[in-house]
Amino acid sequence: ENSTKRPDIVVFLNGLPVVVFELKSPSREETDASEAYLQLRNYMHEIPSLFIYNAFLVMSDLANSKAGTITAGEDRFMEWKTKDGSYENTKYAQFDTLIEGMFEKARLLDIIKNFICFSGDAKILAGYHQYFAVRKAIESTKKAANTDGKGGVFWHTQGSGKSLSMVFYAHLLQEAMSSPTIVVITDRNDLDDQLFSQFAKCTGFLRQTPVQAESRKHLKELLAGRQANGIIFTTAQKFEESDEVLSGRRNIVVMADEAHRSQYVEAKVDTETGRVRKSFGLIIRESLPNATYIGFTGTPISSKDRSTIEVFGDYIDIYDMTQAVEDGATRPVYYESRVIHLKLNEDVLRMIDEEYDVLAQNAEAYAIEKSKRELGRIESILGAEETITALCEDIVRHYEENRQYELTGKAMIVAYSRPIAMRIYRTLLQLRPEWNEKVRVVMTESN
């Protein structure tokens, strides 16, 4: 070792040092939980062998108590705010809540075994909201597999670690349901790639390598080639209409990401062709009739939208934006309405409203085709020179009068399309040439 150190508390499990505490006095103004974090980093440098078997770290000044891993930055150390999974009394995180919530014997063993994983080089400890929600989801899925197949809806707001919660869930499912086959469904290729990438980074934790289905035929081959195990990723669009059942097995669990968008179960008559068109949700359920379905979403489901609840069952757990911001899991978002006066006639306004209605519904193929025919007209309106000029003048005015000397950081202007983004960029530089080093255009991979 590099020197002699004496940590405040070390928790041993069968003789192995699995948790290290660093405590600071709440009565001393010069020390706090941040000082405890720096002390822990110092220990890792000076006495590294102590951390070979380390599961996680705890830093506390009694007023603030947080847990994290050896790879986590200070901002990723999180409070453990409940002993039983309730969100009712989580405004303040008490030291005894962390101790009783994490260090009850069975729970500590459960956390070490099932709720710590490596994602690439990062060692990740589940937050309290992830731990209790995933445990609830497992119980809900086991019950659904023996009844109606409706595992429920898992709503954790965007940015709070929903993708990792899905990884923890998939890991636990293997033992809880005797190695079922898991089919993960998204409604966009880019989301499929993102979620697949997250799972692929955790193959050691999952004890298997996820695969992506390239087509309905490929999906059938992947399902037919096994009687258990497997994590298969696919998009809803690959479930093209067919009367063929892909698999009648009961030990299949379907995880639908952003479940509210593409999992409606319905059939409609196309007024143009007279054909009955089935929703993706209906096709999927006819293709996997005996599977158990669980929906994951980061977006509030409208009180008017009963379809998602009817398809998946009741909420398993709700971790909303308010709770996530209070916990520091996500940043707060504030909305301020801005009105740009444009000269649009009533027909144009009606057309825009209709298109937003289409986009707000599930992305069925026939709805997309109808929408495409009108989008060109909307782009010509939103991309008109007078529209862009009015928008950019308002942005410049708002920045210089209200934000320039008040905030640091970055701002994002999200455009309707790539050509419109370029017009906004050029117009901003025409108005403020000195912003040349401050303004850039960033293109997304898909549009």
State each model region's role:
Residues 158, 260, 281-304:
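Conserved helicase ATPase motor motifs in RecA-like P-loop NTPase domains
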Residues 418-443:
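Conserved helicase motor "Helicase C" RecA-like lobe of SF1/SF2 P-loop NTPases
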Residues 214-232, 245-249, 447:
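Conserved motor-coupling elements within RecA-like helicase/translocase cores
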Residues 154-156, 180-188, 409-417:
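Conserved RecA-like ASCE P-loop NTPase motor core of nucleic-acid helicases/translocases
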